[in-house]
Amino acid sequence: MLAVKPIYDPTLREELCKLCGAEYKPDSYAYFAADVNGDATKINFIIGICTFRMKGDNNVIETLKQAPGVEDEEALVIMARAVMNFMYRAGVENVRLDPAGTDRNTAEKLGFREAKDMTINLSEFYKAPCKYTD
């Protein structure tokens, strides 16, 4: 079963960044995705991490990476969407994806396009996320 959770503890955030090959930045936020047992009381394995920054007009998904040996792009997309939803509910209008932080295929599945400077207007996105083309 998939679990996606924010990482509040900075030490754990740093450890999971290291595990997934993401740069640790103390001022960034992060979510992790994990495979958990049926009642969600035990982590079977870490799937990946998503680090992001929310500061004024500088709202960026910095990293979206899988743990070594894990190939679950669907879980990465779900985790990134959870981060985007959190940002939207926090009042963020636009979010940019750092293209160095994930692969192009995953970025496109999330709706980020180079032609749009890898930026999504979250208000427009959440009007119809399955039809978002802007």
Which residues fall in each region the model found?
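Short amphipathic alpha-helix that is part of the acyltransferase structural core
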Residues: M1-P26, K131-D134
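C-terminal "cap" of GNAT-fold acetyltransferases
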Residues: K116-D134
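Conserved GNAT acetyl-CoA-binding A-motif
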Residues: M87-A100
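Conserved donor-binding loop and adjoining core beta-sheet/short helix segment
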Residues: D35-E74
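Non-catalytic positions within long, well-ordered alpha-helices that form the structural scaffold/packing
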Residues: N85-Y88, E108
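Short loop/turn microsegments at loop-to-beta-strand junctions
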Residues: D27-Y31
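Conserved active-site alpha-helix within GNAT-family acetyltransferase domains
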Residues: A100-D117
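Conserved acetyl-CoA-binding loop-helix of GNAT-fold acetyltransferases
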Residues: E71-N85
